[in-house]
């Protein structure tokens, strides 16, 4: 799904770090992954956020859009903020004459909402 040769930019909402670390830690605590593997994943993610990803800071505009998306799409809080950040990146791409952003999520409910907001969506679970 992601081809580094294409030199694509990866944008993540600032809250993504909290979500990733929490999800990996919970899986480790439930023994679905080992503590060592969890530590490796968390450390790699922290490194990637610092070196490879463009972090979208939480602005008043994104928070307000997230609140609206919670109401209109029935999304959970962080999901609504993720979608608001994706919409903001897409808007910047289009204004700048760049191709539209692709919203990447494995959450089917969030993907339906993103599609209804006009975003192109890719689900990583669709790629073996």
What is the role of each PLM region?
Residues 20:
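Conserved phosphoryl-transfer catalytic core
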Residues 5-8, 27-30, 48-52, 69-73, ...:
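Alpha-helix C-capping/helix-to-loop hinge sites
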């Amino acid at each position: 799904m992601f081809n580094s040769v294409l030199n694509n930019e990866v944008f993540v909402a600032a809250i993504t770090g909290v979500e990733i670390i929490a999800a990996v830690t919970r899986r480790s605590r439930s023994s679905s992954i080992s503590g060592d593997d969890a530590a490796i994943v968390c450390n790699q993610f922290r490194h990637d956020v610092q070196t490879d990803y463009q972090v979208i800071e939480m602005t008043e505009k994104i928070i307000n859009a997230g609140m609206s998306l919670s109401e209109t799409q029935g999304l959970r809080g962080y999901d609504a903020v993720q979608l608001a950040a994706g919409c903001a990146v897409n808007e910047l791409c289009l204004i700048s004459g760049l191709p539209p952003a692709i919203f990447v999520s494995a959450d089917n409910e969030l993907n339906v909402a993103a599609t209804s907001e006009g975003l192109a969506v890719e689900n990583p679970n669709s790629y073996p």
